């Protein structure tokens, strides 16, 4: 408590704009981390982007913005590890009006509580421009990791990208040799990308999948790892998963949706290779194989695999993520399982657990605040977002209910 009081006094001694950026959440119910006990009637103070104090009956310095809470539910900031800044609203992100970009971020991402997102294929020029403006404080948005352009099989652009403008489509890498794959990864990196995305299995038509040759996939993975970048793969089917496993991919960007041959032995091999998986079950909810896809996700989890939350938002133009929570519950995952997917698991995957993925003193001031507790009743309560706070800045605030 003495340390907290020192920090509070330090907050109180500040003046001007710095105080205006400090935030307090009072009388909250807090889930500090996936396995930690619930804390009730708790106050959290954020200063300079970090959690400066946590406790009961803490005095709140004057000048600090206090968010109305009344028993609201507080978590570490949610991650969405599969999004795409792919719509026309992201064109010319370097010069689009800041208030419009903030509204677009809210519409697609922050209204669902996401304080960190991973973009798994978009035009890197636009996405890095958006990220730059978010980081400067000009635009209210989440922390953004980006893959830039995904790498496709030779002559392997998926059919669902047929409507892309010809100029953009011509820029999509389809490396035909290992050297070309290395060059494509390097070109992305030169534009400021953070991760690598491979389409190890790509749908040329709804019933025809083509694949990246293994030597090309291995070259891309090796180049990504040489720069300490995680490598994600869109697998599609058994062969796409097999290439991802054998090339050293870190994360499956989807559960496989053409499920033939994907058996328990392969799932256990993925876990043994320390691969993670993003289920994206809403994407497949209309599939005739959805029951089996959910089974694969649960098998992976039960075998000890790390699941990450992601929705393919941006490719999916319906930005409501409620169905993803419903599908995860139907798959047999618990509240604590899904909370890990949203917080501690992605923080661990991105090697930032020392300061992200939990609510703790000195940690990042990234919080997602809900109006209803998903531990009680329905996992869809994860979508009932009151506030999203990123580094102490409120980047989403739900409109008042009358």
Named regions from a protein language model:
Residues 348, 361-402:
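C-terminal cap of metal-dependent C-N hydrolases
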Residues 92-140, 172-194:
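Alpha-helical scaffold segments that flank or form the walls of functional sites
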Residues 136-243, 258-261:
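Histidine/acidic-residue-rich, glycine-tolerant segments that coordinate divalent metal ions
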Residues 34-75:
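Histidine-rich, glycine-flanked metal-binding segment
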Residues 104-128, 141-149, 193-203, 230, ...:
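Divalent metal-dependent hydrolysis catalytic cores, especially in the metallo-beta-lactamase
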Residues 292-374:
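His/Asp/Glu-enriched, well-ordered alpha-helical/loop segment
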Residues 198-199, 203-294, 303, 308, ...:
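Active-site core of metal-dependent hydrolases
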């Amino acid at each position: 408590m003495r340390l907290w009081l020192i920090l509070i006094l330090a907050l109180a001694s500040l003046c001007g704009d710095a105080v205006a950026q400090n935030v307090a959440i009072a009388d909250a119910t807090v889930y500090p981390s996936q396995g930690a006990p619930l804390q009730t009637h708790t106050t959290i103070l954020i200063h300079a982007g970090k959690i400066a104090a946590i406790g009961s009956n803490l005095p709140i310095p004057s000048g600090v913005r206090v968010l109305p809470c009344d028993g609201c539910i507080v978590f570490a900031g949610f991650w969405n590890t599969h999004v795409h800044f792919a719509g026309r609203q992201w064109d010319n992100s370097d010069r689009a009006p800041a208030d419009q970009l903030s509204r677009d971020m809210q519409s697609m991402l922050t209204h669902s509580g996401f304080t960190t997102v991973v973009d798994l294929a978009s035009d890197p020029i636009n996405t890095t421009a958006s990220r730059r403006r978010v980081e400067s404080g000009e635009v209210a948005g989440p922390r953004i990791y980006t893959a830039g352009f995904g790498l496709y099989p030779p002559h392997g652009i998926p059919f669902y990208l047929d409507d892309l403008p010809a100029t953009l489509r011509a820029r999509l890498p389809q490396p035909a040799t290992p050297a070309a794959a290395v060059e494509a990864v390097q070109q992305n990196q030169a534009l400021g990308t953070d991760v690598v995305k491979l389409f190890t299995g790509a749908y040329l038509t709804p019933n025809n999948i083509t694949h990246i040759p293994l030597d090309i996939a291995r070259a891309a993975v090796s180049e990504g790892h040489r720069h300490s970048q995680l490598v994600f793969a869109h697998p599609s089917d058994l062969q796409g998963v097999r290439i991802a496993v054998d090339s050293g991919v870190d994360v499956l960007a989807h559960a496989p949706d053409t499920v033939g041959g994907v058996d328990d032995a392969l799932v256990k091999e993925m876990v043994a290779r320390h691969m993670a998986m993003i289920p994206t079950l809403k994407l497949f909810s209309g599939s005739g194989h959805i029951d089996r896809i959910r089974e694969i996700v649960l098998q992976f989890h039960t075998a000890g695999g790390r699941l990450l939350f992601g929705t393919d938002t941006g490719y999916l133009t319906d930005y409501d993520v409620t169905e993803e929570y419903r599908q995860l519950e139907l798959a047999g995952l618990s509240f604590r399982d899904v909370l890990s997917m949203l917080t501690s698991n992605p923080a661990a995957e991105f090697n930032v657990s020392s300061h992200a993925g939990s609510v703790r003193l000195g940690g990042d001031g990234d919080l997602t605040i809900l109006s209803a507790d998903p531990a009680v009743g329905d996992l869809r309560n994860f979508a009932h977002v009151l506030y999203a706070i990123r580094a102490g800045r409120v980047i989403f605030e739900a409109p008042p209910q009358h």
